[in-house]
Every structure is written in structure tokens, then in C-alpha cells.
């Protein structure tokens, strides 16, 4: 290309001449038209300059001579991979506040090398000091406090990194225009809310940023890490359980707060939808932590034996397609849909004593059901308490932990009530049993009236017929489920029929134990007189629900269930609850006798309330 042609191109674009004038020392007038001088500078046009720190002033974004240079910020970075190479050493990073986190990190050669070696995997950046949660890679550095410490790891993720490159560009907004807040990685109803399975763990948090004036939905949608439900209107944010924030609200007031996403689930009482191509993304049942289930290996072993037996028997059957139809018709004839008004009145009265129990133990959040036993004492499942405190915590610390993170309300019948409707729990945990799976907690007085206790309504469990569970399945509003009692003598047959029927419908034999863990093997459950078995649609969040007979008598506490999965969903096999008479007898033992006599002495001389109308 001739010098004459190059000169004509430069004079045709005065904007670029202005940039040279702005950023370099003044060139003498007689040299401005010298083509040799222009030729040297023309090799460094902005589109050809590599993104080095010394050359950034030539960015096309910087066109104003009087623009204030962006401030710098220091961040400490640790590469949490390849420990032999990096030896957990800390890297000091100084970067411009207008840079995105991703762009800033890539100025470190160690990070660039690791990104290159981790091709096909997604970078995760988690705040360790100064900022918490997994950070959005597009977050402007101005949102990160000075001196923060972050840790970089990598994971396999289905979403492609290049789809989010729009978030890695520099930002020119003032730091005061941003809002930063955190989201629990596990939802309150819809558990799977993130695309990346590595992040989908209890206790993990996502650090999200947005612009003031922007809606919550737009902010989470642009974040890029949430599942497609974020595009709909059927979700909201919950703050500390007592505050609901709709996704159409602006993010302005969310600064520094922690929230949980509550997304609505498809309504199907018996079969839980599971998206075939998304793993377990849409499961709405609560599966127990593996470390809890692993404590009781006999249940898994018996489950394998039973599945093998059922599979062997089912292979011998020729008319497999008709079996499921016959089973459904038979079950339908056994169960009535109508409920006598008298029963409804009984259940309406006792339902006031059923409570919604919620906890948030440093990010480990969940919910269950409880009910008033006597005065300020409430009853729930022992495995619920184990889930609250977490793995490896000494039992001597349980009382203090639950007193700090557990809340109870009895008014969740339509919308979650406000804070003054919640009871806290005293730092007291003395009465419980792992075998019967029950635990007693004591509420703190808060000026609100505690509903009547159900202690005086304990009666023997019926051997057949209908029973009624009242609770908060999946953390939803209080509801009632009518169940058919499975007699003890029919438990094995019922389980085999259900396994066979679901196999014919396309189910696979990989059982999952929901609601709870259990120390009882399958064989022990079949012959255990301390439990009542039944069919119910109540899944996660219903542990601790009271079970009543048709007279409104308290007969059991809902505890456990066995399910099987198949290609399109999850179905229950059988559920069971601990019989209240067995729990009551256990409380009378020497270990708890003093406590039991104290609470029961208040009613010894009081005539039992009639449960008949």
C-alpha cells in the first residue's frame, strides 16, 4: 500500500487523528503531514492492539480528553485446582474497577494457562473473604470490596461458556448504580434452580449483581446461571421466611441481603414430573442426604433383594400390560373420594394445631411439619432435627443450633404470615428417639396464643379404612390428604403389587427414600408394629405431619416413604408413620419420666375432651 493512499485514509477519518492528539505528546505541525510518521503509528490502530495493561488507554471507549481514569482495585486470587503446581499460593491482582471479573482474572498468566488446560469446563469463582458466594463472571470489579479473596475452580457444565461472553465485557457504569445480593443455590419448592449441577448443593450461595431500577426477574435472567423457569412469572424471592418479594419488583432494596427462590411446581399429586434430558431438574420431592441414608445399609440391601425378587416374578408374567390397569381399577374401587361432613369438622378443629417448621442454618435451609403436643411443646421427626444441624455436629450443640435458626408458625393456610406470627424455639433438646423418629421441641413465648395441644387425642391406630394427614407438603400451604390404611398383614403383598404395577408402567427399580432416613430394613418395616402403613401423595416437607382417624383422633406421625423412579416421573410405593401410642409409651420410660409426669400432671384431673360432636 502506497504512502499516498495511507495518508488519504487518515485525513478522511479525523476522529482517529484526534485520538492520537489526545493520548500522545504534541507532534510539530511540520511533521503532521509526514507520511513516514503516520506509517509508524498506523500499525497501532485500536482494532489491532492486543489487550495489554499498558495499551488499554487506546481502547475505543476512551474518546474524551477530560475523562477521569478508572480507579484500580486489589483482589487476592487462589487457584483451587492442580495443588501440586499452584500449592495454594495467593496471587495479587490489581485491576480497573470498570473491568469485568472475568477480564480482570485473565490478566493473570496463571489463570490464562489454567483456562486453556481446562477447555470444555466452566470457571467457578467463589468469594472466600470480603465477599461471599459464587460470583457472576461478568460482575464489574467495582462491585467487589477492596482486598477480597476469591478461589477459582472448574467444573463440567452443560451450558456453554461462550454463550455468556456478553457478560465479560467492561462496564462503564458508576459503582453506585449496581446492587449486589445473594441467592441460595437450592430453591424452597423447586429444588433444582441452577443450570450447573456442581453449584446445586445445600449451603452454596450465588452472588448476583444488577442495575438499580432493573426488575428482579430481568436481573436473574441476565445472570445466565438459572434454569429456564426464570422466564416465567411463577416464582418469587423469600427473605428470612417472613418476607415475600415478587420478581417484578426492582432490585434497589436487595443490597447485601440473602434470598431463596420459591418457584411453583406442576400440580400432580401422585406422579412427580422429571424432565428426561435434565437429570433430576424438576423433581419436587426431598431426598435425604446420602450420609444419613448410609448410616443404615440394611434398608438398601433389603431393597435390592426385593427388587430382584419382583423382577424375577414379573418376567414370568405374560399379560404385563393388563396388570397395571387391573391394579388401578382395584385400588380405585377401594378408595372413596367423598368425605363426610362430620369428618371435615373434626379435621378442621385439629388442623389449627398443625405448624409449618422452617430453618436456615447458615445457608442450609429447609422445611417440615410439626404439631402442638402439649402447651409450648411441639412434636416433629427426629430426622428433621438431624437435617437442620447437619453432618458431624455433636449432639450437645444441637439445642443451641436449632434455637438460632428454627421458626414455627401455625397460620400458613394461604400466604406465609409475617414475622410476628412466628415462634422461635428454646435452646432445649432433651426428648427424642431415633427408632421411632420423633423429637420434642419447646417454643418461646412471643405474646401470640399457641394452639391447643393434641396430647389428649392420642388413640389406637385403625387396622383398616381411611386416615387423614395434615401438613405442609413441599413447603406449601396447609393441606389434608386422605389415605387408605395398609394392614400389617398386607404390607408385603401391597409393596409387591405396587412394584409390579409400576414396572409394567415403565418404572425402573431404583428406589429412593424420601421424607426421611430410616434405620429399619424393609423386612423390619413389614413386621413392625410401631408403624402404620398407607398410600399418600405427601412428599418432601411433610415429615412430622400428624395422622388422624375419621374421629379426629391422633393416631400417628408421618415419617417415611419408599418410591421408585421411571423415565417420566417418580411414584410412591408405600409410606409409613410412627404410631403415637408407641411414642407416648416411650416418653413414659424412666429416661423421660420426670418430664412426662410434669406435662401430663396438668391434665390428670381434667376430664378428657370429647371428640364427638
From Swiss-Prot:
It is found in: Nucleus; Chromosome; Cytoplasm. Residues 40-56 have a biased composition (Basic and acidic residues). Its EC number is 3.4.21.-. InterPro entries: Peptidase_S1_PA, Peptidase_S1_PA_chymotrypsin. Autocatalytically cleaved; autocatalytic cleavage takes place in trans. It is an enzyme of class 3 (hydrolase). GO terms for biological process: DNA damage response; DNA replication; protein autoprocessing; protein-DNA covalent cross-linking repair; proteolysis; replication fork processing. The record marks 331-332 as: Cleavage. One of its GO terms (cellular component) is nucleus. GO terms for molecular function: peptidase activity; single-stranded DNA binding. Keywords: Autocatalytic cleavage, Chromosome, Cytoplasm, DNA damage, DNA repair, DNA replication, DNA-binding, Hydrolase, Isopeptide bond, Nucleus, Phosphoprotein, Protease, Ubl conjugation. The modification Phosphoserine is found at residue 25. Residues 1-72 are annotated as: Disordered. There is a cross-link at residues 19, 29, 62 (Glycyl lysine isopeptide (Lys-Gly) (interchain with G-Cter in SUMO2)). It comes from the Eukaryota. The active site is at 383 (charge relay system), 437 (charge relay system), 543 (charge relay system). Belongs to the FAM111 family. Interacts (via PIP-box) with PCNA; this interaction is direct. The PIP-box mediates the interaction with PCNA. Single-stranded DNA-binding serine protease that mediates the proteolytic cleavage of covalent DNA-protein cross-links (DPCs) during DNA synthesis, thereby playing a key role in maintaining genomic integrity. DPCs are highly toxic DNA lesions that interfere with essential chromatin transactions, such as replication and transcription, and which are induced by reactive agents, such as UV light or formaldehyde. This is Serine protease FAM111A. It comes from Mus musculus (Mouse).
Amino acid at each position: 500500500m502506497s504512502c499516498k493512499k495511507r495518508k488519504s485514509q487518515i485525513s478522511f477519518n479525523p476522529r482517529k487523528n484526534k485520538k492520537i492528539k489526545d493520548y500522545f505528546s504534541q507532534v510539530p505541525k511540520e511533521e503532521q503531514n509526514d507520511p513516514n510518521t503516520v506509517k509508524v503509528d498506523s500499525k497501532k490502530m485500536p482494532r489491532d492492539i492486543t489487550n495489554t495493561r499498558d495499551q488499554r488507554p487506546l481502547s475505543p471507549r476512551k474518546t474524551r480528553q477530560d475523562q477521569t481514569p478508572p480507579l484500580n482495585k486489589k483482589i487476592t486470587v487462589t487457584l483451587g485446582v492442580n495443588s501440586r503446581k499452584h500449592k495454594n499460593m495467593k496471587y495479587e491482582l490489581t485491576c480497573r474497577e470498570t473491568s469485568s471479573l472475568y477480564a480482570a482474572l485473565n490478566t493473570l498468566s496463571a489463570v490464562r494457562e489454567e483456562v486453556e488446560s481446562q477447555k470444555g469446563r466452566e470457571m467457578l469463582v467463589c468469594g472466600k473473604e470480603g465477599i461471599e458466594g459464587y460470583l457472576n463472571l461478568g460482575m464489574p470489579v467495582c462491585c467487589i470490596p477492596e482486598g477480597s479473596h476469591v478461589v477459582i475452580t472448574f467444573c463440567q457444565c452443560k451450558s456453554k461458556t461462550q454463550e455468556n461472553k456478553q457478560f465479560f465485557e467492561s462496564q462503564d457504569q458508576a459503582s453506585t448504580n449496581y446492587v449486589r445480593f445473594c441467592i441460595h443455590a437450592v430453591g424452597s419448592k423447586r429444588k433444582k434452580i441452577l443450570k450447573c449441577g456442581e453449584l446445586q448443593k445445600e449451603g452454596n450461595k450465588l452472588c448476583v449483581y444488577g442495575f438499580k431500577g432493573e426488575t428482579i426477574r430481568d436481573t436473574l435472567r441476565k445472570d445466565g446461571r438459572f434454569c429456564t423457569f426464570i422466564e416465567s412469572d411463577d416464582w418469587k424471592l423469600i427473605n428470612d421466611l417472613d418476607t415475600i418479594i415478587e420478581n417484578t419488583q426492582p432490585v434497589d432494596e436487595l443490597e447485601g441481603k440473602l434470598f431463596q427462590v420459591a418457584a411453583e411446581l406442576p400440580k400432580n399429586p401422585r406422579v412427580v414430573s422429571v424432565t428426561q434430558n435434565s437429570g433430576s431438574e424438576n423433581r419436587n420431592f426431598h431426598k435425604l442426604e446420602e450420609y444419613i441414608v448410609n448410616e443404615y445399609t440394611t434398608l438398601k440391601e433389603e431393597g435390592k433383594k426385593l427388587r430382584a425378587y419382583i423382577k424375577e416374578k414379573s418376567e414370568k408374567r405374560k399379560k404385563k400390560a393388563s396388570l397395571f390397569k387391573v391394579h388401578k381399577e382395584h385400588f380405585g374401587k377401594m378408595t372413596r373420594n367423598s368425605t363426610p361432613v362430620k369428618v371435615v369438622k373434626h379435621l378442621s378443629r385439629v388442623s389449627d394445631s398443625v405448624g409449618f417448621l422452617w430453618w436456615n442454618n447458615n445457608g442450609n435451609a429447609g422445611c417440615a411439619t410439626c404439631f402442638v403436643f402439649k402447651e409450648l411443646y411441639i412434636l416433629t421427626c427426629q430426622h428433621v432435627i438431624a437435617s437442620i444441624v447437619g453432618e458431624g455436629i455433636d449432639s450437645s450443640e444441637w439445642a443451641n443450633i436449632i434455637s438460632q435458626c428454627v421458626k414455627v408458625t401455625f397460620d400458613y393456610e394461604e400466604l406465609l404470615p409475617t414475622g410476628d406470627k412466628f415462634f422461635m424455639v428454646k435452646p432445649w433438646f432433651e426428648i427424642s428417639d431415633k427408632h421411632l423418629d420423633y423429637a420434642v421441641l419447646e417454643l418461646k413465648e412471643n405474646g401470640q396464643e399457641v394452639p391447643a395441644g393434641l396430647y389428649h387425642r392420642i388413640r389406637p391406630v385403625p387396622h383398616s379404612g381411611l386416615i387423614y394427614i395434615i401438613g405442609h407438603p413441599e413447603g406449601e400451604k396447609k393441606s389434608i390428604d386422605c389415605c387408605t390404611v395398609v394392614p400389617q398383614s398386607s404390607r408385603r403383598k401391597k409393596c409387591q403389587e405396587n412394584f409390579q404395577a409400576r414396572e409394567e408402567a415403565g418404572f425402573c427399580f431404583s428406589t429412593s427414600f424420601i421424607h426421611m432416613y430410616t434405620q429399619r430394613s424393609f423386612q423390619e418395616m413389614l413386621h413392625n408394629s410401631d408403624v402404620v402403613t398407607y398410600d399418600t401423595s405427601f412428599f418432601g416437607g411433610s415429615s412430622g405431619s400428624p395422622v388422624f382417624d375419621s374421629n379426629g383422633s391422633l393416631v400417628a406421625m408421618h415419617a417415611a416413604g419408599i418410591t421408585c423412579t421411571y423415565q417420566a416421573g417418580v411414584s410412591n410405593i408405600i409410606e409409613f408413620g410412627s404410631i403415637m401410642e408407641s411414642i407416648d409409651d416411650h416418653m413414659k420410660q424412666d429416661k423421660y419420666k420426670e418430664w412426662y409426669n410434669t406435662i401430663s400432671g396438668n391434665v390428670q384431673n381434667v376430664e378428657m375432651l370429647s371428640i364427638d360432636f
